[in-house]
Amino acid sequence: MAEHLMNDVPFWQSKTLDEMSDAEWESLCDGCGQCCLHKLMDEDTDEIYFTNVACRQLNIKTCQCRNYERRFEFEPDCIKLTRENLPTFEWLPMTCAYRLLAEGKDLPVWHPLLTGSKAAMHGERISVRHIAVKESEVIDWQDHILNKPDWAQ
């Protein structure tokens, strides 16, 4: 009986991030697209500024990469989140499953692993589909900074 109950525990509650298979690791991504928005770094302070400018490979409507398997060929600056480098990504959104699980928290109620689809995530406006703009439409990147410093407000 106890063995049966163990099997009913979702993998993200029964395994550490390091213990997860590659498929389990990948499935943690909710597909919000927040990682695929360009970030700017202040050269003097190293502060990161978030923009609403989508990577050229991001399909804004679906919040999915157009060329996920070959994304590094198309976008050399694309960053691969791994178990090893996760602690260095302090800029991950507070809603990110990787961040939440690393902090000992559970998945949010709208997460696709719990709901079976991305509809609840989009409904909660977690995804970037309602704020993202195409890189090709941007004239001045500074106009698209979401977390402007006080001096730039």
UniProtKB/Swiss-Prot annotation:
InterPro entries: Puta_zinc/iron-chelating_dom, UCP006173. Transmembrane segments: none annotated. This is UPF0260 protein YcgN. Belongs to the UPF0260 family. It comes from Shigella boydii serotype 18 (strain CDC 3083-94 / BS512). Signal peptide: none annotated. PANTHER family: UPF0260 PROTEIN YCGN. Coiled coil: none annotated. The gene is ycgN. It holds the Pfam family CxxCxxCC.
